[in-house]
Amino acid sequence: MLRAALSLLALPLAGAAEEPTQKPESPGEPPPGLELFRWQWHEVEAPYLVALWILVASLAKIVFHLSRKVTSLVPESCLLILLGLVLGGIVLAVAKKAEYQLEPGTFFLFLLPPIVLDSGYFMPSRLFFDNLGAILTYAVVGTLWNAFTTGAALWGLQQAGLVAPRVQAGLLDFLLFGSLISAVDPVAVLAVFEEVHVNETLFIIVFGESLLNDAVTVVLYKVCNSFVEMGSANVQATDYLKGVASLFVVSLGGAAVGLVFAFLLALTTRFTKRVRIIEPLLVFLLAYAAYLTAEMASLSAILAVTMCGLGCKKYVEANISHKSRTTVKYTMKTLASCAETVIFMLLGISAVDSSKWAWDSGLVLGTLIFILFFRALGVVLQTWVLNQFRLVPLDKIDQVVMSYGGLRGAVAFALVILLDRTKVPAKDYFVATTIVVVFFTVIVQGLTIKPLVKWLKVKRSEHHKPTLNQELHEHTFDHILAAVEDVVGHHGYHYWRDRWEQFDKKYLSQLLMRRSAYRIRDQIWDVYYRLNIRDAISFVDQGGHVLSSTGLTLPSMPSRNSVAETSVTNLLRESGSGACLDLQVIDTVRSGRDREDAVMHHLLCGGLYKPRRRYKASCSRHFISEDAQERQDKEVFQQNMKRRLESFKSTKHNICFTKSKPRPRKTGRRKKDGVANAEATNGKHRGLGFQDTAAVILTVESEEEEEESDSSETEKEDDEGIIFVARATSEVLQEGKVSGSLEVCPSPRIIPPSPTCAEKELPWKSGQGDLAVYVSSETTKIVPVDMQTGWNQSISSLESLASPPCNQAPILTCLPPHPRGTEEPQVPLHLPSDPRSSFAFPPSLAKAGRSRSESSADLPQQQELQPLMGHKDHTHLSPGTATSHWCIQFNRGSRL
Amino acid sequence: MGSRSSHAAVIPDGDSIRRETGFSQASLLRLHHRFRALDRNKKGYLSRMDLQQIGALAVNPLGDRIIESFFPDGSQRVDFPGFVRVLAHFRPVEDEDTETQDPKKPEPLNSRRNKLHCEFVRTCTNAFQLYDLDRDGKISRHEMLQVLRLMVGVQVTEEQLENIADRTVQEADEDGDGAVSFVEFTKSLEKMDVEQKMSIRILK
């Protein structure tokens, strides 16, 4: 059907395609031998056209969103329908006949499932079940009411003579029409309401209704259709009963199919540990299988997919890997948005078909009025009943929005196209009326609902971050209410929910979740986990702000902060610890977090220098090779380490040099050099960097003890520097290992002798060395208070290790060429962590953090860390001494 | 339910209880029925044992605390008025100021907001008392830890639990005294749609 529908998209191509396609097909000719060039349009035609259409739709979407003003006023669905109209007009003009319409087969088999799956999978299940009563009422009673009243009223209109007699339809025909036109359409509702942002309860009621009413629509449509085909004379009483029974069969059967597949899906994903790569595929395959199965058994397919998505989510999310989760999310969103776009566009195109149009003003106007009127009436009546039972009644404003939000869409259109003209003589009139209704609801109501919501001051949805308190209190409330219901002896909603949760915990989760996932599955814990990671990030962010507020404002600060931030964020993200950093992305609401992430990403892309690539032959289809990002991290690390090793060596030699030189001259040069460098870096005390401190430490550890002492005697600053380094590190680490650290020669030990368990588990870490392990241990354990200490350390180390020169730092890029140029760019990298050191927590806390962190190769690691932690000494220095001091160090570090 | 009429006569001080708690006659009857069902030996009061025998309450992580809330000041028994008084905390508020509430007659927005506020404060009080074991008007870190121990179902170590408790207290603690006061507690609840979360419809 798609082939048929799209076969003429090639119109623009037709001219080009026409002639060459003839060639291979012309019979009778002897084969012309080997062809250099063959044009095989017909072999690729169908998929090619499909791809082209999707491309057109996507491009249209891009164009619409170029202007924020337009999209904020006009819903995308309206724009797409209008675009469809234009495209349809063009097609009509070129081909002289209407083509590429929305085919019911295509619609039901390919376009609808992704949208429904997406909405079912991402349905806020708690909210949905909290309002299940209302949703079901509106979906079942409301739809039945709409169908019968609209059909009957139209029939009455005809009897009154207001519909032209050429519309040959009896009561049954009108009921059939009423049944297909009465259903609120999930696609249209979703498209419009997603942009309106009404409060959650209102949204879930309207949207849930549109999803669940499918069963009713299908049943009504089928029953009426078969009645019409049988002829009203032959319909017997048992048929009516069967009709009622089929309502239950179709809806419950559909839901059951969905749940069965949800169960299968959850169970399957439990065993995919070794084949992570197919996890996303499984989700889509089984959900689609649920849809097709339900469709095959003529059950409610929409209900099946909704239930499948709703049911499996919890377990699937727990089972599949973090990357698979992201993949599922994005693929689902992409498919749904793609399908939605195509649907609306094809709807527009379908309207441009003069052969369909059999206009009858009475019918069209009558339908429009009745639809709006009965929807409103139905909503008011049902809400009145429901409010007798609801704790929080739906007020008038809610009712207005609900009535007005009853949009009709592609489902109605597809159903009306499916009618059999020989059985339903008035089909053409119905089609025309449906098109008008769909266009009216999507365009007029879609356009006006936003201003209406604003004008009525409907409570909007507010998105706030989850907090531990909220999560905890929510759970307590649930338990309290369940307990009170127990005491009262009334088995109400809370009671059953509590029961279900216990059942789920005891049996279902055990069966459907991986052991590892099941153990750590707790919502409070989850929130805690995420909060901590977010805090970690924001802490790094804040470090930047604090820094700039302390008066040490340097032009390069922000950029360097962001480097630190990105590298840490990146590391966290790569760590694969199962934490989703983007809290908000999970929800459908787009937030600033995404943008922030994107900005970070670009910054990282731009800021990281591209390391030499080593091409590895990695073409395993079953396992994802490590990311380019990870490889880059590794490369950056390795290069940094290499450089550091060199610098260590060279500083050693330097020391020998400097020692032999007369002091005064040295100071002079020092000053000059220092000034030059500092000036170059931006005229402030910017000479500090870990190389310098490292150099100082190295002077201590270097073999020439006597020279060392000599220098400390003669040079106060130098002496101070040494002392401070030692004290600062000891303070931070609380180990009294200062002397040890000074004795250890860091360079050979930078690559840890034995991989820690984290390294074994997380292969990417092996390249990062102990520091990365340090980070990971902190993040996975999540120690709230002392985490900050951990962060101080890890950040500083990360900075020095993994942050490459950032081309966004103007100073760095405009550094004058220096004898030891390779080291130069790194020199200032250490500054931003200084203020952070003032965050240092009480020793006991720091200690606690340490003891909790990875303890395998702890002590040596710490010692290795110390050169990197050299920035600590900065806090103890008054600015004045700092200047000269840095100069000295700089001199040493940079001298050749 | 045939015994309902006979119960009506049995409720001692039915009217005064009703006035005090605002329960309707029907709910009061229902509660009395329940009270008598829980009261095993027809002793006219409930002991802790009686409530502990409710099966579902035993699995409820907060079950013990709920039971405890029926026995203020360490008393061993609760009579029917006391029983009803505790449950009255979970009654939807609307009855008092909107005796004549009716969809036809919309109340002014103000009163509705007032009502919501009442409900909010009441909800907070209910919950707060559940946390605040020593009744000092503050949820200390220790108290938070105890609740968390009940609530967090997964296998976390004591240390991790302590961290969560620290974190939770820190999050809500605004004046930095290391404990969550009632005001701070209500603030942390403000973002939730609390008004519908602490009432049981059946207790009208």
Swiss-Prot record, chain A:
Residues linked to a glycan: N199
Chain positions covered by the region annotation Disordered: 658-686, 701-720, 818-864
Membrane topology of the entry: Multi-pass membrane protein
Catalytic activity, reaction form: Na(+)(in) + H(+)(out) = Na(+)(out) + H(+)(in)
GO MF, one example: sodium:proton antiporter activity
Major subcellular location class: membrane
Pfam family, any one: Na_H_Exchanger
Biased composition (Polar residues): 854-864
GO biological process per UniProt: monoatomic ion transport; potassium ion transmembrane transport; regulation of intracellular pH; sodium ion import across plasma membrane; sodium ion transmembrane transport
Side Cytoplasmic, residues: 1-45, 95-103, 156-173, 222-246, 298-331, 382-398, 450-896
Bias kind Basic residues: ranges: 660-672
Chain ranges on the Extracellular side, renumbered to this chain: 67-73, 125-134, 195-200, 268-276, 353-360, 420-428
Domain of life from the UniProt record: Eukaryota
PTM per Swiss-Prot/TrEMBL: Phosphorylated by PRKAA2; promotes its accumulation at the cell surface. Phosphorylated by CSNK2A1 in a manner favoring its beta-arrestin binding and endocytosis.
Transmembrane segments: 46-66, 74-94, 104-124, 135-155, 174-194, 201-221, 247-267, 277-297, 332-352, 361-381, 399-419, 429-449
Resulting phenotype, S712A: Abolishes SLC9A5 phosphorylation by CSNK2A1 and abolishes CSNK2A1-mediated binding of ARRB2
Region (Required for interaction with ARRB2): 576-721
Tissue/organ expression: Mainly expressed in brain. Expressed in neurons of the central and peripheral nervous system. Expressed also in testis, spleen, and skeletal muscle.
One cellular component (GO) term of this entry: postsynaptic membrane
Subunit structure as annotated in this protein's UniProt entry: Interacts with CHP1 and CHP2. Interacts with ARRB2; facilitates the endocytosis of SLC9A5 from the plasma membrane. Interacts with RACK1; this interaction positively regulates SLC9A5 activity and promotes SLC9A5 localization to focal adhesions. Interacts with SCAMP2; this interaction regulates SLC9A5 cell-surface targeting and SLC9A5 activity.
Protein's job: Plasma membrane Na(+)/H(+) antiporter. Mediates the electroneutral exchange of intracellular H(+) ions for extracellular Na(+) in 1:1 stoichiometry, thus regulating intracellular pH homeostasis, in particular in neural tissues. Acts as a negative regulator of dendritic spine growth. Plays a role in postsynaptic remodeling and signaling. Can also contribute to organellar pH regulation, with consequences for receptor tyrosine kinase trafficking.
Sequence similarity: Belongs to the monovalent cation:proton antiporter 1 (CPA1) transporter (TC 2.A.36) family.
PANTHER family attached to this UniProt entry: SODIUM/HYDROGEN EXCHANGER, SODIUM_HYDROGEN EXCHANGER 5
Protein name: Sodium/hydrogen exchanger 5
Species this protein is from: Homo sapiens
